[in-house]
Structures are given as structure tokens and as C-alpha cells.
Amino acid sequence: MSSSDAGLEEGPELSITLTLRMLMHGKEVGSIIGKKGETVKRIREQSSARITISEGSCPERITTITGSTAAVFHAVSMIAFKLDEDLCAAPANGGSVSRPPVTLRLVIPASQCGSLIGKAGTKIKEIRETTGAQVQVAGDLLPNSTERAVTVSGVPDAIILCVRQICAVILESPPKGATIPYHPSLSLGTVLLSANQGFSVQGQYGAVTPAEVTKLQQLSGHAVPFASPSVVPGMDPSTQTSSQEFLVPNDLIGCVIGRQGSKISEIRQMSGAHIKIGNQAEGAGERHVTITGSPVSIALAQYLITACLETAKSTSGGTPGSAPADLPTPFSPPLTALPTAPPGLLGTPYAISLSNFIGLKPVPFLALPPASPGPPPGLAAYTAKMAAANGSKKAERQKFSPY
């Protein structure tokens, strides 16, 4: 048995279908594809995994591996040893300098990274110690997505064991809410998913055909009406502004702001919404957060903020998914909406995973159906109050840093 197969015999086999996405540089992609595609063809045949590589001329590409757990791990093993072979063949500068370790960058939804890190970093520390590989979870989201890069470095055998343990963790902790996947060749705009409505994706895309819309309906399991491009008939979506206001505990506001304001700037850029965090009032345990912009921008900004809070709660000792009853979930109804909010967008929302949309042809603005003349019955604006993760108030703000 070769060393590339040694790590595949450990642990019980899981009878499920696994999908693993990796971010690779152009040189790495070229090595995996090989001359006339011979290398990737051999990996597909020997591992029985389905391997796709995203198109595009950008420096980075997404490699997606799908199949049974045995097939996926076998493919990862072959990729790791191929990259190690390339590093051995590369001429060393100076002769005495040791070659760099093999590095794989996994792409994982941010809502699952909290479980991967564990309480106070205990889980990721355990993975490092038991596998011998170096693992680091990026502190920032990948551009225009709700995913993070998880970097795994070391010798091929250590990487294989590490990927096994990472996959075991993410399989036990499914992603929460909608996932906006990272794709280097796409410039995703804002996304809104709402009950009795389709989804809206704005960006630089080509034409969409009714056949493609039907395919999206089948993939998502929900109807996607092919309607007018206007959110509210006769009005430009970019001009329909409204505001939402909610409270965030002082001990969690740091994860929303980020180091030197990096996180809040990222959320503003991704959502296109204006986000204002109020000053801390004397004796108050919460901070006011006001989001202003189009309904689409507000929905995405609210989701991104909630994802930050969920990650911070998981790393601070809270149980993932055990949010207080008054914690707003992704794409929840408007919290404190101004009268200018379009009534048709105040429906009860739900989240659809966008992961299935990767690999489809470029999609333009898929319009929402015309808004109803009045708000849905029984819906009233409210202000949700978020409790601290441990139910107490802390004097100092909790800071979130990458592990």
C-alpha cells in the first residue's frame, strides 16, 4: 500500500455524498489538470470522485470534489501528493533551504467555522495536535460571499488526516441559513430571498433563458418566477430606501466592527447598505445598529451581521444554533422599518442555499414578482433585542480574531 492510501484506512466509512471545495492558484490548477488533462483524468478514474474546476482567467480557481467520503478523500490524497511532487521537483534556492510544506485551502461556510474552531479554540487545537498539520481559519470572509478560507499545511499524510477531521466536523454541523458561495470569476451583487418571491442577483451577467430559470427551480426546490426586473412595479429598486434598527449586546459588537473597522467595512461593501453603530450610552448593555438602503441591501447586511454574531457566540462558548428566542435569524422580517419600506417585501422570509448555482451559466438579475398591494396580514414591525451569548453583560468588548 502506498503512503497516499495509508490515511484512507483509518476510521469508519460514512455512506454519504460529500462535496469539498478548494481554492487554488493558477499554477496549482495547471499541475492538477496536467498535460492535455491527463492528470485530472487519472485522479477521477482512480478515486471515482467527480472533480470540476471553475472556468475563468482570474489568478484563483475553485476545485470542487464530489462523491462518497472514500472517493473524496482518495482524490484529496492524490492532489496532495501531486503538489508535494511538484515542490520536490522545484529547484531550491541556495540548496540548503528546506522546501515549503504542501498547502490546501478549503472553502467552508462561515456559519460552520465556529464548530471547527470550537470553544476557545479547543477543537482546532485538537485537530492540529492529532494530525500534525497546521490549520488556520481566516478571520475575514472571502469577497462577495459568506464563506471563509481554511488553510491546511504540512506533509501529505498529515493533510489527509486533517481534511478527514475537518469534514467530520462540518458534516456534524450543517450550515445555518443561506450560503453565498465564493467564486473568483463572479462579481456577485446583493441577494434577497423572501417568501412567495424569487431571488434577486445583481451583477455583470449575460442573458438568462426560461430554460435556465426552470433548471434553477429544480435545483433549489422552489419556484423562481420569471417576472419584471423591478422590485416594485414602476420604481427603480435602487431608489427604494428604508431603514432597520436593532440592538446588539456590547460584548458582541466587537465582532461586527472587526479589527480597526475591517468587518463593518466589509459588510458595507458587500451589501451596499449604510450601517451606523450608535455610541454606547452610559449604563446601557446594548448598542443601536441602524441599516439604511434598499430592501435587498438591508436583507443581505442583516444576514452578514447575524453570521458574525453566530460565529462569535460559537467561539466564546455558546452552543451553535442555541440562539435566544429574540435573536433575529438570517433574512428575518424588517425590524424597525421606516414608512418608505415597500410593503411587498415584508413577507415572512426563508433562506435557500445558493451553493447549487455554482456551475450554471452566468445569471443576470432574476427579478422578484410584483409586490402585493398591502402588507401580509398579521405582520407588524418590531424591534428584536439580542441577548449576550452567555446571558450576562460584560464591561469589555469581546474581540474576534482568526485562529
From Swiss-Prot:
Function: Single-stranded nucleic acid binding protein that binds preferentially to oligo dC.
Gene: Pcbp4
Location (main, coarse): cytoplasm
Cell location: Cytoplasm
KH domain: residues covered: 17-67, 101-154, 241-293
UniProt keyword list: Cytoplasm, DNA-binding, Repeat, Ribonucleoprotein, RNA-binding
Source organism of this protein record: Mus musculus
Classification via SUPFAM superfamilies: Eukaryotic type KH-domain (KH-domain type I)
Protein name (record): Poly(rC)-binding protein 4
MF term (GO), any: DNA binding
Gene Ontology cellular component annotations, sorted alphabetically: cytoplasm; ribonucleoprotein complex
An individual GO BP term: negative regulation of DNA damage response, signal transduction by p53 class mediator
RNA-binding keyword on record: yes
Tissue-level expression: Widely expressed, with highest levels in testis and lowest in heart.
